[in-house]
Amino acid sequence: MKFDAKPVIGVVADLNRRPTHPVHSVGDKYLDAVTAGVGALAFIIPALIDRPGAAFTDPADIGRVLDMLDGLFLTGATSNVHPSQYGADLSNPASPSDTARDHVSLSMVREAVQRGLPILGVCRGFQEINAALGGTLHQEVHNTPGLSDHREKDDDPLDVQYGPSHAVALAEGGLLRRLAGDATTQVNSLHGQGVDRLAPNLAVEAVAPDGLVEAYRGETGGFLLAVQWHPEWKFRENPLSVRIFEIFGEAARAWRARRGASSLAS
């Protein structure tokens, strides 16, 4: 194996129906951010569970996949993390879910954190990581007292949906504040769920005006950064988005270099 080559980033797929056939898919904008923003190869991980011989029902399968990776990217999605993943009941039966992705993503996150594998999460991925590590979520931010409506308007053009929506305050001494070179930044907002209780060993990196956590980093182990917004959307036009993917790439290349050194030593 050539360890000076591009790092390999795993991207967990959604399980959707298009129109009636089950399809494992990842949005093009996420793969573009991995290949062009991170400077890596994208490895799509299917959400395969609950069928005979399926991958990822055996914890060893998770490990074998992670053995091939230099980083893990958890993307956004139209579905929500099912509240059973953090010990709660479903408050709205109409809430879209993807329990196959829940199972694969959360299992991947837990094992990746144990290894110190670099992790980046956005939107749903931000919520998945928090749930995987012991945190909880607001199932409907817009119906939570004291919090604003953070959802997009479906009938708006995409450039409006993904356009700047509100400012976030960046934590003093935090990674994002250093990358942004400022105490605040404007972000888009396209989410119905949000962080309620932050998981242990995660530190707040950004907060919305209503107090909702919008970004966090891992305090122990390897590189872990997650944001509630969508930095992958036209990332080339946003200096902070560029830096988020660059620094994830730096962590992935460092991981790959260590893998190479370990392989040569053995």
Kindly give the residue locations of the regions a language model identified:
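Active-site-proximal beta-strand elements of phosphoester/diester hydrolases
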Residues: 225-228
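The feature captures the ABC ATPase H-loop/switch
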Residues: 126
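Conserved G/P- and acidic residue-centered "switch" motifs that form tight phosphate/ATP-binding loops
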Residues: 123
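N-terminal beta1-alpha1 cap of cysteine-dependent amidohydrolase-like domains
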Residues: 1-120, 131-138, 142-180, 184-186, ...
